[in-house]
Amino acid sequence: TLMESGLAAPVQLMAQNELSLGVDHIRFMEEFKYFSALNVFMPDTGHGFVHWSGPMRGGSKRIEWNMTKDEFELYKKGLKRAGRIFFAAGAERVYLPTYQRIQATSVYELDDIVDSVDYGALGLYSMRLVSLNAQGSCRMGADRKKAVVDPYGQVYEVSGLFVSDASLLPSIAIQHPMLTVAALS
């Protein structure tokens, strides 16, 4: 798993932890300068789909993706690592991204608390996940019915328009793809 640090925006933290109503909201805004977040990145196995319905202009998309059990365990491993980093930095509590507002108050209880969230129907869907696909959403292929761009990166629907970024990569890169993208360009 990879980690990225940075100050989380108040909106992101409120959405993740439901700290946006009444007294909780006031307390959160007063204490916001003491909050931080780590993003846990992990490769997935690419079992997602983007469904488009309606006309090209004004239509709608629906994104469908589910985490496998192995990915769920990898994500929990990343949560444990992030929690340890926060406690080592002096955090008094670590909030897990769950709908139940689960928190750990010491590094000694962290593993048990993270492990209490199971993959089963309630576990997987109790996690608040923010997902992005930095790569792989512009499928390359010889069949225009199954791909967005041809084998040379030209968009099937727009002659002369070429894609030359990380969206052409067939899977998530574990290393930074800057040189690969430069070669594609």
Predicted regions and their residues:
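Domain-level signature for respiratory redox metalloenzymes
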Residues: D24-I26, S36, E71, K80-F87, ...
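A glycine-rich dinucleotide-binding beta-alpha-beta segment and adjacent secondary-structure elements
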Residues: E92-S171, M178
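An active-site-proximal "capping" alpha-helix that borders the catalytic cofactor pocket
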Residues: L179-S185
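FAD cofactor-binding and catalytic pocket of flavoenzymes
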Residues: T1-F86, S131-G136, Y156, V163-S171
